[in-house]
Design a protein with these regions (language model features):
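A cross-family acyltransferase "interaction/gating" segment
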Residues: 135-224
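Generic beta-sheet signal
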Residues: 46-52, 119-125, 159
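Catalytic core of membrane glycerolipid acyltransferases/transacylases, capturing the structured
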Residues: 44-102
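Helix-to-loop junction immediately C-terminal to a conserved catalytic motif
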Residues: 17, 22-54
């Protein structure tokens, strides 16, 4: 398959505040060089859940640019609490997770409604750990299973889970804020109780590898019905993690 390169164009004079336009502008401002492989694998006409490894604030804009559509990404609870960052979260259409003590019922309700409206949802299954700890481009944390539950419960006949590997070839790593300062906005987050600074990975050259989608439909659910919901969710989670791990190795 030929590797396709997608130039990042300057902000047009007719620039709108759509999440896709904001993403393109942010990538232009950052001067990132990116390429995409496997874009033709993204299904058309059905809701999608985009999942990916996650090390940088640039990941969501990159995924929107690669898929050429707005994607409503789940994000950490604290991001909806910080002045300035909160406004960016709203402009990008992100959906902050609920406060830990409240569970995630309200978040799942919003996400399921978005899928019912055929919107694209983005989930970073590794959680926040690779964002606050310094990692290597090919490192991968164990996936949480929330995205699989979301896909299984979506009130639609058919939905695709699309795994994407973000493979950084060249980057800068800066320190932006003391981790403990963030505990002011989310005291229950254990990652914010540690010493050190929140890193900020800025990609300079990156490839997005779009993997094989997993289509969840009536046939899929019926095939695994005897295994039970928990076993099916585990299998879907492991399948997507293995796909992204394989793509990251290919991109090294």
């Amino acid at each position: 398959m030929v590797l396709a390169s997608y130039p990042i164009y300057p902000m047009p004079r007719s620039f709108s505040t759509s999440p896709l336009d904001i993403s393109n502008w942010l990538l232009t401002w950052a001067g990132v060089r990116m390429s995409v492989q496997g874009q033709e694998r993204i299904p058309e006409g059905i809701p999608v859940v985009i999942i990916s490894n996650h090390r940088s604030f640039m990941d969501a804009p990159l995924l929107m640019h690669a898929t050429q559509r707005p994607v409503r990404f789940a994000c950490h609870h604290y991001m909806g609490q910080v002045p300035g960052l909160r406004e960016m979260v709203n402009a990008m259409g992100f959906m902050p997770l609920d406060a830990p003590e409240n569970g995630q019922t309200a978040f799942f309700r919003r996400a399921l409604q978005a899928l019912a409206n055929h919107e694209a949802i983005g989930i970073f299954p590794e959680g926040a750990a690779p964002m606050v700890n310094k990692t290597k481009p090919w490192d991968l944390e164990r996936f949480h299973r929330g995205f699989a539950y979301l896909a299984m419960r979506a009130p639609v006949e058919k939905i695709a889970v699309v795994p994407v590997a973000i493979a950084s070839h060249r980057e800068m790593n800066n320190s932006v804020v003391p981790l403990r300062l963030l505990s002011l906005f989310d005291p229950a987050e254990p990652l914010f109780q540690q010493s050190g600074w929140h890193p900020a990975v800025v990609y300079q050259d990156v490839t997005l590898w779009i993997g094989h989608p997993v289509v969840v439909d009536a046939r899929f659910r019926a095939h695994y019905q005897t295994k039970g919901a928990s076993a099916l969710v585990t299998e879907l989670t492991n399948c997507c993690q293995d796909e992204i791990a394989t793509l990251l190795k290919r991109g090294r």
